[in-house]
């Protein structure tokens, strides 16, 4: 479950709009637990390790995890679409995972379209939810920009991706 804190057994509601969720602190559960899992960083590590060590038997597991995340976490709903930094990190990891799966011929054309659409959803969420302030720039904004660069560079070129790529390059 992508919205679950296994330490406290608390589950966030995936059917609530992300912008309506309230972060609660000191209640015995930690929103960062599902965020860490949902960044897909561990899946990226498994994917890179599989690629470097020619362990093709793990690609089915990796694909299943990617498609489970996409199916279980609709854009702008639930805890995993709460802020741009989390979405940007996950989007960049999806790009790396997808690139390896494509190189290894492990994605059918329809599967590739599903993942591309999800990455596009991630990119559009980030560009529409930049964590920018006129008073300071922080790690969240940096993650937003780096994620946008990776996603816009990775996706097929169109007017939207080119515009986002140009924006991110100029930050």
What are these regions, as identified by a protein language model?
Residues 1-27, 32:
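N-terminal transition regions in large eukaryotic proteins
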Residues 14, 24, 30-171:
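Aromatic-lined, polymer-binding surfaces characteristic
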């Amino acid at each position: 479950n992508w919205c679950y804190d296994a330490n406290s057994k608390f589950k966030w509601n995936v059917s609530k709009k992300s912008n309506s969720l309230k972060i609660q602190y000191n209640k015995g559960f930690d929103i960062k637990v599902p965020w860490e899992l949902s960044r897909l960083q561990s899946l990226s590590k498994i994917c890179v390790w599989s690629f470097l060590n020619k362990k093709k038997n793990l690609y089915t597991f990796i694909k299943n995890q990617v498609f489970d995340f996409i199916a279980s976490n609709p854009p702008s709903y639930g805890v995993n679409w709460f802020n741009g930094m989390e979405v940007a990190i996950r989007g960049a990891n999806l790009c790396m995972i997808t690139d390896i799966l494509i190189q290894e011929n492990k994605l059918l054309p329809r599967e590739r379209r599903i993942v591309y659409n999800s990455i596009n959803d991630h990119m559009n969420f980030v560009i529409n939810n930049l964590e920018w302030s006129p008073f300071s720039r922080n790690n969240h904004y940096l993650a937003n920009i780096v994620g946008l660069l990776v996603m816009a560079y990775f996706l097929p070129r169109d007017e939207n991706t080119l515009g986002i790529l140009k924006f991110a390059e100029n930050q």
